[in-house]
Curated annotation (Swiss-Prot):
The gene is ATP7. It comes from Saccharomyces cerevisiae (strain ATCC 204508 / S288c). Gene3D superfamilies: 6.10.280.70. Present with 6820 molecules/cell in log phase SD medium. GO terms for biological process: proton motive force-driven ATP synthesis. It is found in: Mitochondrion; Mitochondrion inner membrane. Keywords: Acetylation, ATP synthesis, CF(0), Hydrogen ion transport, Ion transport, Membrane, Mitochondrion, Mitochondrion inner membrane, Transport. F-type ATPases have 2 components, CF(1) - the catalytic core - and CF(0) - the membrane proton channel. In yeast, the dimeric form of ATP synthase consists of 17 polypeptides: alpha, beta, gamma, delta, epsilon, 4 (B), 5 (OSCP), 6 (A), 8, 9 (C), d, E (Tim11), f, g, h, i/j and k. It comes from the Eukaryota. This is ATP synthase subunit d, mitochondrial. Mitochondrial membrane ATP synthase (F(1)F(0) ATP synthase or Complex V) produces ATP from ADP in the presence of a proton gradient across the membrane which is generated by electron transport complexes of the respiratory chain. F-type ATPases consist of two structural domains, F(1) - containing the extramembraneous catalytic core, and F(0) - containing the membrane proton channel, linked together by a central stalk and a peripheral stalk. During catalysis, ATP synthesis in the catalytic domain of F(1) is coupled via a rotary mechanism of the central stalk subunits to proton translocation.
Length: 174
């Protein structure tokens, strides 16, 4: 137990979040857990620093009704702390941990898949021929519908591309 306390005290939460590159709901949940942990630790230290002994003789000298003091003193002497079964809370924590790990693994797989896709896109961009070196045959090989559209326009006697003059202006000299 002392080893766990020592490790918990030495844990640098900011470093954990940044070094593991945790983001999103996982980082939010981890930060809220840290906040609750710090608050509980602060309350524990505050309660431990308070005195636990009651000076009943002082109250007997101050109050006239000492029978009340005797009764309270007997209750205090009879008091035994109750041991609480923390297994339910531990089960909740374990289920939360499993859920968090599942979310983290899903996030990791999504990120790695996206990185692979981005890397392949980057490789395609870097290995592509410059635009000025492309030929019409290259374009029709990539998009065969271009060739079909041009053939259809020639059959119908349309020699102008729709919207070309609107976009680029009329380049006729005459």
């Amino acid at each position: 137990m002392s080893l766990a306390k020592s490790a918990a005290n030495k844990l640098d939460w900011a470093k954990v979040i940044s070094s593991l590159r945790i983001t999103g709901s996982t980082a939010t949940q981890l930060s809220s857990f840290k906040k609750r942990n710090d608050e509980a630790r602060r309350q524990l230290l505050e309660l431990q620093s308070q005195p636990t002994e009651v000076d009943f003789s002082h109250y007997r000298s101050v109050l006239k009704n000492t029978s009340v003091i005797d009764k309270i003193e007997s209750y205090v002497k009879q008091y035994k702390p109750v041991k609480i079964d923390a297994s339910k809370q531990l089960q909740v924590i374990e289920s939360f941990e499993k859920h968090a790990m599942t979310n983290a693994k899903e996030t990791e797989s999504l990120v790695s898949k996206e990185l692979k896709d981005l890397q392949s896109t980057l490789d395609n961009i870097q290995s592509a021929r410059p635009f000025d070196e492309l030929t019409v045959d290259d374009l029709t090989k990539i998009k065969p519908e271009i060739d079909a559209k041009v053939e259809e326009m020639v059959k119908k006697g349309k020699w102008d591309v729709p919207g070309y003059k609107d976009r680029f202006g009329n380049l006729n000299v005459m």
